[in-house]
Amino acid sequence: KPVVINFWATWCPPCIREMPDLANLARELGDDATIIGIAADSGPHVQKFTEKTPGIDFPLLMAGYKALNLSKQWGNEKGGLPFTVVLDAQGQIHWRHSGALDIEALRSMLKSGDLH
């Protein structure tokens, strides 16, 4: 199944704005796709964010600033956040996006069936 990897941080305003939309999309897609957040942040900051923002129930991994290096390996040349990668069902990179997401475009892509 397709996988969405979203690199984000609690200190990144566009990242914070799109988290509820990603959570809603994860619930909507259910088992048809996986959404994972990788935080360029520390555990305490992420925990505080999730306590203040109910409903963020997709997996969130903490990588600290190593997340920025990892995102560069996935094609984030400038190292900015948010950065999102979509993998198809075979694990190949299908799409990369720097900056705030167009959640409707992401939804359409994931529901199109082209990634399975």
Give the location of each predicted region.
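Thiol/disulfide oxidoreductase modules built on the thioredoxin-like
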Residues: K52-D57, M62-K111
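Active-site-proximal beta-strand/loop segments in catalytic clefts of secreted hydrolases
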Residues: F7-W8, I38-D41, A63-G64, G99-A100
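Proteins that catalyze or organize thiol-disulfide redox chemistry
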Residues: K1-V3, A23-R27, A89-Q92, E104-H116
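Alpha/beta-hydrolase fold active-site loops
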Residues: P2-V3, A33, P82
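Structural microenvironment flanking redox-active thiols in thiol-disulfide oxidoreductases
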Residues: I16-G55, Y65-K72
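Hydrophobic beta-strand core positions in alpha/beta domains
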Residues: V4-N6, G37, V85-V86
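Conserved hydrophobic/aromatic "anchor" residues
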Residues: F7-W8, F49, D57-F58
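Short active-site neighborhood of thiol/selenol oxidoreductases, capturing the structured segment around
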Residues: K1-P13
